[in-house]
Amino acid sequence: MEKGHILIVEDEEKIARVLQLELEYEGYSVTIKHNGTEGLDAAAEGGYSLVLLDVMLPGLSGLEVLRRLRKTDSQTPVILLTARDSIPDKVTGLDIGANDYVTKPFEIEELLARIRAALRQNGTKTEDIGTFLTYDDLRVNEKTREVRRGDKEVELTPREFDLLVYMLKHPQQVLTREQILSSVWGFDYIGDTNVVDVYIRYIRKKLDYPYEKQLIHTIRGVGYAIKG
């Protein structure tokens, strides 16, 4: 049984490959990105159990990737990998949202133990890992179909839930009504695209209107987007 999906953001290909082989042997699935920009894009899409993030990356640094990721995802565990062993460096990484900090070179057994610990601390059983989608204070469990905004549970119909999940998988991206229709209702749907507007309104009544901060935005003449 797959234990979870781990994103490795590491510019040294040899290190990334070794980590991939070890993690896959342990039962994890692995995705690798070799620079900060690609790593941030992948992490922001969600669906990962944990992120292994090198600090010294081309493009965006690992710390900047983490800082930006934490603006939209406070849940996914992140372990920083770095050759810099000073206390100030560790404090900075932990303060901006890292769950742990591992100094290179490291023993793979220790890293695996830290990964297991981070997953436990995240309060997720390994068989359920990778089912959560988060944005700001909105949290969705795809497996149990539970939706929470802040500390309040929100009940959605099956269609409302599917629409919300689709939008959460494309955060800060403008989605046209046609895209939403084909992905949520199916390519064979025959009907008016206004059904999208109707269901967006249903979701807003439950997830946006009771709160000061609105997450679902109308892009006039185009469609909708989830953004802060």
Swiss-Prot record:
Residues 130-228 bind DNA. GO terms for cellular component: cytosol; protein-DNA complex. GO terms for biological process: regulation of DNA-templated transcription. Keywords: Cytoplasm, DNA-binding, Phosphoprotein, Transcription, Transcription regulation, Two-component regulatory system. The keyword Phosphoprotein applies. It comes from the Bacteria. Phosphorylated by YkoH. It is found in: Cytoplasm. Coiled coil: none annotated. Residues 5-119 form the Response regulatory domain. The modification 4-aspartylphosphate is found at D54. Its main location: cytoplasm. InterPro entries: CheY-like_superfamily, OmpR/PhoB-type_DNA-bd, Sig_transdc_resp-reg_receiver, WalR-like, WH-like_DNA-bd_sf. GO terms for molecular function: phosphorelay response regulator activity; transcription cis-regulatory region binding. Probable member of the two-component regulatory system YkoH/YkoG. This is Uncharacterized transcriptional regulatory protein YkoG.
